[in-house]
Amino acid sequence: MVKAVCVLRGDSKITGIVNFEQESDSSPTTISWEISNHDADAKRGFHITPFGDNTNGCTSAGPHFNPHGKTHGNVTDENRHVGDMGNIETDCDGNSKGSIKDKLIKLIGPHSVIGRTVVIHAGTDDLGKGGNDESLKTGNAGPRPACGVIGVAN
């Protein structure tokens, strides 16, 4: 079992923890999160980027993690970036808690997400269905108010 954790912070009041667990190289990865202080009653884009570089805030982390050269999509789509995790949904206080299992996001192997960045966006991810070029790259999810590097956990 490999475990990883990401602590989310940024230029805003948003904070959170994202946990990752993978049993073996062939198992799906479980991703669970608890995020606080985002916009109330909203859907907000949730992605993994290729770099663990946050020297210039969340923008220096790069585009969505896409080692297979696919277009942007939802976490449940066959054709999507490895780093596409869809949207988190916040409650009336701006908090979100949830989990998903994913077969593309890996902690083990050449495309491991350890050392990469989780980004929470300021807008809703259109899941690649926005009808323009930017939708196929970013889902038009907007600015990046919070992010954190994924590190190995005990």
Swiss-Prot record:
Source species taxonomy: Eukaryota, Fungi, Dikarya, Ascomycota, Pezizomycotina
Keyword Membrane recorded: no
Keyword Cytoplasm in annotation: yes
Name of the gene encoding the protein in the UniProt record: SOD1
Name of the protein in question: Superoxide dismutase [Cu-Zn]
Subcellular location as annotated: Cytoplasm
Reported function: Destroys radicals which are normally produced within the cells and which are toxic to biological systems.
Family statement: Belongs to the Cu-Zn superoxide dismutase family.
UniProt enzyme class: oxidoreductase
Cofactor note as given: Binds 1 copper ion per subunit.
InterPro entries recorded: SOD-like_Cu/Zn_dom_sf (IPR036423), SOD_Cu/Zn_/chaperone (IPR024134), SOD_Cu/Zn_BS (IPR018152), SOD_Cu_Zn_dom (IPR001424)
Domain of life of the native organism: Eukaryota
One family name in Pfam for this protein: Sod_Cu
Subunit structure: Homodimer.
UniProt: Zn(2+) binding residues: H64, H72, H81, D84
UniProt xrefs under SUPFAM superfamilies: Cu,Zn superoxide dismutase-like
GO cellular component entries: cytoplasm
EC number: 1.15.1.1
Organism of origin: Pleurocordyceps sinensis (Polycephalomyces sinensis)
